[in-house]
């Protein structure tokens, strides 16, 4: 943020039985990190209703969203989400943890913002992210990036997903050099994680990523409704003012 904005930042927590929210408030905007839980009475989609009410109350829009639940619930869940929150014009990364009951939802996490305009990032006819900016930087969050062809090999799907990240970033004048964080949700991760890393490292070498700041990354073993070998999320930052915004590597714990 700019010098003026950085001088005035307030972090508050809002908690209830249904919602846990961390709000970061600055003169330019409010950012909301929201976790919503299903109702204890078994009404799973109530978490979307509570989310929608919160967003309307605070005049906030969703940039990206994760849903943790059975893949069988995807179609009905997306309908419930749109009824509660309006047209879904942001990426929803829907993932199912191993051992989860196929008809169970466990929660949703949302990054939302008010006070700044969020422009959608589109790729292949889908909204795959949002981009917004302040005086010092442009920020991009991408989600639900996955291969179009899920019948090809897992290595080919991994390569296709990485290339989609690159293409999506290029539409907003960003590249891998601007990526600070990646999340890869990998189906059957233990059976091919080494292979996935080989594919990722090869592309990073080709693009010169290892010559700069390498994005922090997390790999998680989960399934997805598309049946893809991998689904990705990305956070990228492109500084306008290097005096106030900087990206640097930190040691891994």
PLM regions and their residue ranges:
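Short, polar/acidic, helix-capping and beta-turn segments at strand->helix junctions
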Residues: 1-253
């Amino acid at each position: 943020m700019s010098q003026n904005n950085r001088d005035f930042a307030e972090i508050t927590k809002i908690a209830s039985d249904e919602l846990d929210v961390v709000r970061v408030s600055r003169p330019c905007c409010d950012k909301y990190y929201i976790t919503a839980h299903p109702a204890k009475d078994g009404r799973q989609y109530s978490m979307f209703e509570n989310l929608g009410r919160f967003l309307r109350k605070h005049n906030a829009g969703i940039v990206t969203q994760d849903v943790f639940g059975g893949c069988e619930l995807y179609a009905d869940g997306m309908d419930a989400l749109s009824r509660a929150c309006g047209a879904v014009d942001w990426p929803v990364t829907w993932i199912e943890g191993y051992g989860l009951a196929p008809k169970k939802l466990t929660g949703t996490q949302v990054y939302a913002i008010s006070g700044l305009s969020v422009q959608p990032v589109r790729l292949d006819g889908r909204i795959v992210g949002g981009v917004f900016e302040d005086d010092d930087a442009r920020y991009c969050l991408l989600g639900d990036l996955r291969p179009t062809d899920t019948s090809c090999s897992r290595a080919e799907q991994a390569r296709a997903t990485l290339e989609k990240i690159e293409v999506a970033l290029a539409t907003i004048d960003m590249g891998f050099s601007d990526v600070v964080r990646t999340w890869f949700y990998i189906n059957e991760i233990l059976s091919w994680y080494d292979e996935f890393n080989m594919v990722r490292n090869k592309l990073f070498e080709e693009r010169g990523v290892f010559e700069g700041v390498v994005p922090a990354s997390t790999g998680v073993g989960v399934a997805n409704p598309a049946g893809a070998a991998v689904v990705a999320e990305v956070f990228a930052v492109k500084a306008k003012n290097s005096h106030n915004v900087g990206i640097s590597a930190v040691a891994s714990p």
